[in-house]
């Protein structure tokens, strides 16, 4: 599994603009066969298990947030025009106070891109399950980006895990569909192959 460090620190101010982040991945990731080859992936580094439709690429970048060094890792797979990704930000015990600010920045970044995001009003209640079968509520966010000749659809959810040692893991589970000609963002990203990716993400 390769590790690619290609994100300059000056991009941090836009580091939570997920369309830009994942869009950049599209130029790095190779599209796999349309045949979905589901496999369970366990990340000891990011402390989760997930079901990916192919072997994911592993990318890392170092961020500076409020004078604190933070590692962001991303595991992602591109299948045709769909990118399945899990972003993880790990906060050490003495960085835990940054949690709310990072979450707010991450969730607000897309809606702040008013020149791109035309419809970001769909938010749905959902739930996720931890590896030890505890179930918690979560919200799913659906976004549509209008391009001149097509759209991009995105579904994201944010999950926060607090460890007994005081560390905080902030996960963003997302699917981005590129080159969408027509359709409803919520209906399309609720199809089984995308729903499975969200349902089978489990923090350890």
Q: Residue spans of the language-model regions?
A:
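Bacterial N-terminal signal peptides that target proteins for export
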Residues: 2-21
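C-terminal motif of bacterial Sec signal peptides marking the signal peptidase cleavage site
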Residues: 28-31
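Post-signal peptide N-terminal segment of mature Sec-exported envelope proteins
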Residues: 40-62
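Short acidic, Gly/Pro-enriched loop/turn segments at secondary-structure junctions
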Residues: 62-71, 99
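Short, well-structured beta-strand
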Residues: 73-96, 114-118, 126-204
């Amino acid at each position: 599994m390769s590790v690619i460090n290609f994100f300059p620190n000056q991009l941090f101010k836009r580091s939570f603009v997920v369309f830009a982040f994942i869009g950049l991945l599209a130029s790095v990731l190779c599209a796999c066969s349309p045949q979905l080859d589901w496999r369970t992936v366990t990340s000891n580094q990011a402390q989760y298990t997930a079901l990916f439709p192919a072997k994911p690429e592993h990318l890392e970048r170092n961020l500076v947030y409020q004078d604190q060094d933070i590692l962001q890792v991303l595991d992602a797979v591109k299948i045709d025009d769909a990118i399945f990704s899990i972003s993880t930000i790990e906060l050490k015990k003495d960085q835990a106070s940054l949690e709310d600010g990072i979450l707010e920045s991450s969730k607000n970044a897309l809606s702040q891109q008013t020149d791109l995001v035309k419809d970001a009003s769909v938010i749905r209640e959902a739930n996720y399950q931890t590896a030890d079968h505890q179930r918690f509520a979560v919200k799913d966010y659906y976004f549509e980006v209008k391009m001149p000749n097509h759209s991009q659809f995105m579904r994201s959810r944010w999950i926060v895990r607090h460890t007994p040692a005081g560390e905080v893991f902030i996960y963003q589970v997302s699917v981005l569909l590129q080159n969408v000609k027509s359709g409803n963002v919520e209906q399309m990203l609720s199809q089984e192959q995308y729903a499975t990716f969200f349902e089978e993400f489990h923090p350890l």
